[in-house]
Amino acid sequence: YEWDIETRLDALPPGGHEIECSEFGQDGAIYDTYAEGGVRITAFKVLHCEPQNTFAMKVEYKNRTFVFSADTKKCDSMLHHALNCDLLVHEAFPPAELYAAKSNRPLEVAKKISEVYHTSPREAGEVFAETNPRMAVIYHMYNNDDVIGPALEQIRENYQGPVEIGYDLMVI
């Protein structure tokens, strides 16, 4: 990697970039982590794996709202913060049966992973129906054709609005 390092040092200072960090606790509070130039970023706790869980993010700018779920289950904090947002990017793990087959895991293990620690496509459809985003996107999904179809079918059991399957480098 020597050539890469030398090339970068020709153009950039060796110290790199400074990082400004906002630390916050795990008490479930809502944190305004950034507010500048009309942009407001809020972190809020969502359910993933007790006791650590994860934090979702809500970005607001010029009367537009984007919410990113992080790894989570359906939970009240997500329903509250994503209500009527413009774009909700929410995780949805593959349907348990397909996940078990693709990962060579027992069905019981696959169900725990996809339905206890993560959001199933069916449950993501419930979240979308209850929050009414202008656009919904799911991620954390195998993007194989044999998975996308069943996942969308499960989402459509509860939600008829606009939904996309996220993929790397997707532009919305």
Where are the language model's segments positioned?
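Binuclear metal-dependent hydrolase catalytic cores
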Residues: 1-67, 73, 150-172
